[in-house]
Design a protein with these regions (language model features):
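Short amphipathic alpha-helices in soluble, non-transmembrane regions
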Residues: 61-69
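A structural signal for short secondary-structure junctions
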Residues: 19-21, 39-42, 74-76, 106, ...
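Zn-dependent metallopeptidase/amidohydrolase metal-coordination segment
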Residues: 112-161
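A short beta-alpha structural unit
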Residues: 26-35, 46-53, 79-98, 124
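Midchain, well-structured core segments that form catalytic/ion-binding scaffolds
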Residues: 1-56
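Flexible, glycine/charged-enriched surface loops at secondary-structure junctions
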Residues: 11-27, 72-83, 111-116, 172-175
Length: 175
């Protein structure tokens, strides 16, 4: 039943991403009891991280999980529970911060591009209290939060220059 649910969530996120472009769902923890190769587990607990830049899409994905759980209860005769242990709404970065980062990049002839982060960051918490922005150095192959992630030293140095200039301009109201 768990494998069906996880695959259903993956498919729902992929379908949503094809139309909206930013939905992501990840199952990062899985606990099976008993954990034996030849025993059907009596209890499975797992965590799912569902993200999108639009809260409506997140809500739709959660609703699809609820519907699949109900379907699995009926078809498989299992009991399920759904518990939301951590919920932070998507946060847009402040235009003043984004403009400062773009301006700093321009001043060093370093290309900057607006992207949506697929991962949760501290800025999601801070955005409720003040203006926030994020700066990412490019990772080879676009890999992020993965063992394949690698950023060249020169890209890290360039990002540091851009960040320093942007913070200076914001701190001195010189943007």
């Amino acid at each position: 039943a768990t494998s069906e649910l996880i695959l259903s969530l993956e498919q729902a996120a992929q379908d949503s991403a094809e139309s909206a472009g930013t939905a992501v769902a990840t199952v990062g923890e899985l606990s099976v009891d008993p954990s034996a190769v030849n025993v059907i587990p009596g209890l499975v607990e797992f965590s799912a991280d569902i993200r999108d830049v639009n809260q409506v899409v997140i809500d739709q994905l959660v609703d699809s999980v609820k519907a699949k759980l109900q379907s699995l209860e009926e078809s498989r005769g299992v009991e399920t529970t759904l518990e939301c242990t951590y919920e932070v709404p998507p946060a847009d970065m402040a235009p003043v911060c984004r403009d400062a980062l773009h301006g700093a990049g321009d001043s060093f002839n370093i290309e900057t591009v607006d992207i949506h982060s697929g991962a949760g960051h501290d800025t999601m918490q801070i955005a409720a209290a003040t203006d926030t922005g994020l700066l990412f150095a490019p990772s080879q192959g676009g890999h992020s939060h993965s063992p394949l992630e690698w950023t060249d030293w020169w890209d890290c140095a360039a990002a540091t220059e851009v960040l320093t200039e942007a913070v200076y301009k914001l701190a001195t109201n010189n943007n």
